[in-house]
Design a protein with these regions (language model features):
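Amphipathic alpha-helices that form helix-helix packing interfaces
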Residues: 242, 249, 256, 286, ...
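C-terminal helix-coil-helix/basic helical segment that borders enzyme active sites and/or dimer interfaces
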Residues: 20-28, 290-321, 334-342
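Glycine-rich flavin
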Residues: 32-42, 46-152
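Glycine-rich beta->alpha junctions and the first turn(s) of the following alpha-helix
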Residues: 193-289
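Residue-level recognition of alpha-helical structural elements
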Residues: 4, 8, 29-33, 60, ...
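A short core secondary-structure module
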Residues: 147-188
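Glycine-rich phosphate/cofactor-binding loops in nucleotide/flavin-utilizing enzymes
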Residues: 339-382
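Glycine-rich phosphate/pyrophosphate-binding beta-alpha loops
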Residues: 149-154, 234-240, 358-361
Length: 382
């Protein structure tokens, strides 16, 4: 573990007590975990991916993965908010103008600025990398018009990395990314999140109507959005989402293991549930799911960091693998928890609901498997 990784892991632990304490309320009240995000900002976790020269920790994919898995064990809603913040931060650091980076990255490093992505649109569904919305020039910058379907931290973030088709785009791949301030005129949140799980991540539709942004707020060159999504957003999001899934699975495993070890049968002379062979079998299956998915995640990170030309296939696959491993572990944990797991809100029941999101979060598990199947057959992915 690197020094940066050790530092950020310890910093994440410092906020863990607050986050874990709030998790049930965040879920029950379906409220944004503002206290948790403030705590993470105070201990500099939000600046994990900010380069050192801008006051951040200079962390990378491995550090991000560890922090997100740890956060997800306490509160998956909070972990999802932080994941999308990390993705937005990575884009700003990689593609922002010098002026924009100097203005924003130190504030992010200090935990004073929360950002997020605004990619998904009704017109392209799970294929978020193909926006149908449009940017048009206004003389000194651009007007943005877009309908976004699922924006994490909608109405709560300080800025949004927004995707649209590029000016004069002729293909869906010709897209552009812009940084939009939360105070921008014409930016509107439509409704509130009412999903099955991740109840506190404030994922809601947003509308941009003639939102004016200056040229300095375009992230990358004209028509470079698709490339940025592949090179910057996809690795961070896929690996981060996989880490959140494994954090959820680890929490479920721990809850179930604690339950079966403590549960005694009075009619059987105090025998523990853990002594039943079927219980041991389910425990073994959970261990195998967790360990195999974690090994795949570690290998994916290693290949991505080293620049392995085959890394993209693993980046595509890891979110699907971790999502399925999480569902498998959580399902077994619910079985081991018995009626108490289903009847007690805020514990395993909450984790069960939170685990469902990864499979339908774009790119969905089905879309990712479609990509992998095409790659295995030597067919074009898009």
């Amino acid at each position: 573990m690197t020094k940066t990784e050790e530092l950020m892991t310890e910093n994440a632990k410092a906020a863990q007590e607050i986050i874990a304490r709030n998790a049930k309320e965040v879920d029950r009240e379906r409220r944004f975990p503002r206290e948790n995000i403030t705590a993470l900002g105070r201990c500099r976790v939000l600046g994990l991916l900010v380069p050192v020269e801008h006051g951040g920790a200079g962390g990378g994919l491995a550090e991000m993965s560890r922090a997100l898995e740890q956060l997800a064990q306490a509160c998956p809603s909070t972990a999802m908010v932080v994941l999308m913040h990390f993705c937005g931060t990575a884009v700003i650091a990689a593609k922002g103008s010098t002026k924009l980076k100097q203005a924003l990255l130190p504030a992010i490093a200090r935990g004073e600025h929360l950002t997020t992505l605004a990619f998904s649109e009704p017109g392209s569904g799970g294929h978020f990398y193909f926006p149908v919305s449009q940017a048009r020039p206004n003389g000194h910058g651009f007007f943005l018009n877009a309908n976004k379907s699922f924006v994490t931290s909608a109405g709560e973030a300080d800025s949004y990395v927004v995707s649209t088709r590029a000016v004069n785009a002729k293909t869906p791949q010709e897209s552009a990314l812009f940084l939009v301030d939360k105070r921008a005129e014409g930016l509107e949140v439509l409704g509130r999140f009412e999903g099955l799980g991740l109840a506190g991540n404030a994922s809601a539709p947003m509308r941009l109507h003639n939102v004016a942004v200056d040229a300095e707020h375009r992230l990358g060159g004209e028509g470079s959005g698709f490339e940025t999504m592949l090179e910057v957003v996809l690795p961070h999001f896929q690996i981060g989402a996989a880490s959140v899934s494994l954090g959820i699975a680890a929490a479920a495993f721990q809850m179930a293991t604690t339950h079966v070890s403590a549960r005694k049968y009075e009619h059987a002379a105090g025998a523990a549930l853990a002594e039943i062979p079927r219980v041991q079998f389910l425990e073994a299956e959970m261990v195998l799911e967790l360990r195999s998915a974690r090994a795949y995640l570690a290998e994916t990170i290693r290949r991505a960091v080293s620049g392995d030309p085959e890394a993209m296939l693993d980046v595509i696959g890891i979110k699907a693998r971790a999502a399925e491993a999480s569902l498998a572990v959580v399902s077994r944990a619910m079985t081991l928890g018995g009626g108490a797991a289903y009847a007690s809100p805020g514990g395993l029941e909450r984790i069960f609901r939170d685990a469902q999101a990864a499979s339908v979060m774009a790119p969905t598990t089905d879309v990712l498997k479609d990509f992998l199947g095409k790659a295995a057959l030597g067919l074009p992915l898009l």
